[in-house]
């Protein structure tokens, strides 16, 4: 039997020979040598003993307080006590006071035993050693241990136990090595204690050595020892060896079954855990609360609701009803929550007789995971007000995470204040990490950075949270600098995948491509290259850096392993970064491959791409595909459809989709309001707003202000302004930008400037709006002053839209030289690459000044074909200045690019009319009529009288 066990386990015969030759002791010594000085493997233990030996004699044998002397007042006939009566009394005292923690109590007993000469009784000495260990008096216990001339296995075990109980695991292993080295006998308890110490030191890889000792000495039949070996093997992720120990156990108790099941679950094998449970029930072993908690947790991991319901029934049938057994009830709550049945989870929670903080945390996390955030906050309130349960660290971490996901900065700050009052931050670093993460998700990077810098003891999670906070809020430079600090702070081997993934999100522009590639190399170096999560994140990084070639190349190299997430990374990534056509092409490639079926995320990306490209027919196809392939249309998908139809100028379909939503959320209302305002349906926006029963947010008011701008209605706009002030939204940078745009478009530029200056926090959008407003009103010099003020702001930099507003202002005010100078500085000084809109305003600027030939040379000198908007600006200038020759040449280009655009024909016809060329004008007009082309008429809007109010 012994030979079979050696061969079938992971313990090689060579390992067994190592034991026989005594080298196993040296191997154990080598394992813990990095914690000890060269002088000895228990140097800390022996050093304390030498240092305090004299102190031991004086302190233990010194007179004790009268209160402690009263321990011996009950001894009958103290004057005439015999050795036997003293011995019996001492044994009784040791039994009675074994749970005492007062330091003087064991010293008094020690003093009495010393006077009576009872210390050489090994049973008494071992109990006294245990007594010292429980009171934390290791110095005294070590001196007593050394004074014993003879030591049996119980004495050695008592001393090792004392060291383990007081966290001196290195000394415990050292004493175990000394015990074997001196040839002392040991038993299964000794090996169990050594296994416990190795487990605490994370030396699970040395479990095979203890296993060898157990096999050689025939102690492997002890169930408790086998359970400890299984635990130690599994802790080192060596589950196969743990299973081997379990397989060869002759006598398995419930602890053995629970150990193997819990370790399978902990090592990511929930199905194995369930298989062992099936074997256990077949063997006739009855389950206990630990068993049921484990197998129900395994059901949670694989999200098997049907199996979970069956286990729930078995729990009740076995007499472990969740109402009476809280641990089982907590597991059932978590199982139902993870399987999406929050109603059943809530029912079990309400039926619990004695709820604890774990019960509340389980249902709270369940609500949060299923998007029921209001119910989650309700549980938090119930914990404190009804159940009188104080939230613990796990509760705080969960609530902080919810606040971060919902961007509830006010509630998040309140939770932070609670952690400070309860002194949780000083007790648990995970609380600080969760608060840093919450502040990052709420956009409060200043608060996150302050908390990070004031934290003295940071771990890798702290760094990851701060890097993510910087990356999520656009502070890419700070994120990269912090990553460099992490590299210098930690060695490569200690890096986690989360660290590299956190910095990858900061690589979102072409300027970050080189840095992103270096991070990609780090992933490969750390061995995370084949990890699906890292591979998909690398794809997103390359898409964000505009390197589509590398992104698609990475996808191609994953031909055998890529999953739906990989395709969604490309489809959604391209759609969100502006590569809409590539997003649709990726979907076509996935469909042609035929291995993977699309899901909700896929359709969200393709519908968004169709909307941005204005492909209404393609969008309708995806709408039909969603109806056909999904059980029901998710509200998020319907909101995306509304946005898509709005961008494709199909208002009727957008409103129809909105009407089909059974329970529209605020996002649904905002989407339809934005769709209407984008398509000049301002009055419909306000009519729809009157039916809104939900509390509007900042995005709602941005849509209302946009509609007011289109209507030229200051009365509507001012009412909306009053409403958002009452709700405290005036400081929002996007609201500020919309207010500036509304007031300036309605002729109230001074009011717009007051809003801009008083808002406190201005986004780049607000700056762009105020620059554009001054340019629109012919105040080009003021617009340039504002641009200089923006460019000198260290917290933000001018972007593409900033230069569009600036060049527009220069064009309207006739500042040609300044405009050309700013155009030149765009890429050289600010790193902004010119696009079509910038070139349109340069052509318009030159055209207004009559420099038509220079405008033509500007277009042709760019070196790449220009879009119709650029040529259209030159055609308008030719019309204004009556240059029919150049106008005809430009018009021919436009007729080829957009043959169905009536405005080009009419613009050229008007040029001929101005110079008396009626025949050409008539011919062009006839072409418009024959082709059934229509030009949208221009119009102006004024606010004559507005009797309606915004409610």
Swiss-Prot record:
It is found in: Mitochondrion. PPR repeats lie at residues 121-151, 152-186, 187-221, 222-252, 253-287, 288-322, 325-355, 356-386, 392-426, 428-458, 459-489, 496-530, 531-561, 563-597, 599-629, 634-668, 669-695, 697-731, 732-762, 763-793, 799-829, 835-865. One of its GO terms (biological process) is RNA modification. One of its GO terms (molecular function) is RNA binding. Its main location: mitochondrion. The keyword ATP-binding does not apply. Keywords: Mitochondrion, Repeat, Transit peptide. Pfam families: E_motif (PF20431), PPR (PF01535), PPR_2 (PF13041). Residues 870-945 are annotated as: Type E motif. The keyword Transit peptide applies. Residues 1-63 form a transit peptide. GO terms for cellular component: mitochondrion. PANTHER family: PENTATRICOPEPTIDE REPEAT-CONTAINING PROTEIN, TETRATRICOPEPTIDE-LIKE HELICAL DOMAIN SUPERFAMILY. Belongs to the PPR family. PCMP-E subfamily. NCBIfam families: PPR. This is Pentatricopeptide repeat-containing protein At4g19220, mitochondrial. The gene is PCMP-E2.
